UniProtKB/Swiss-Prot annotation:
Gene Ontology biological-process entries: translation
Keyword field contains Ribosomal protein: yes
Designated name of the protein: Large ribosomal subunit protein bL33
GO cellular component terms, semicolon-separated: cytoplasm; ribonucleoprotein complex; ribosome
Primary gene name: rpmG
InterPro entries for this protein: Ribosomal_bL33, Ribosomal_bL33_sf, Ribosomal_zn-bd
SUPFAM superfamilies to which the protein is assigned, alphabetical: Zn-binding ribosomal proteins
Length: 64
């Protein structure tokens, strides 16, 4: 049997969507799902991803 992996599925959510007063293309919060290796990356992920609601690249942080 295969071992249980150290990879877990995490959700990334935009940090600028709630605080931004810029004009939006549509309402909503941008979220992405990805995998991370808990053994190598113990802290929370923080990546620059495209936010289709704000129509620009923003910082997305890992949420629980």
């Amino acid at each position: 049997m295969a071992k249980k992996g150290t990879r877990v599925v995490v959700t990334l959510e935009c940090t600028e969507a709630r605080t931004s007063s810029e004009p939006r293309r549509s309402n909503g919060i941008s979220r992405y799902t990805t995998e991370k290796n808990k053994r190598n990356t113990t802290e929370r992920l923080e990546l620059k991803k495209f936010n289709p609601h704000l129509n620009k690249m923003t910082i997305h942080k890992e949420i629980k």
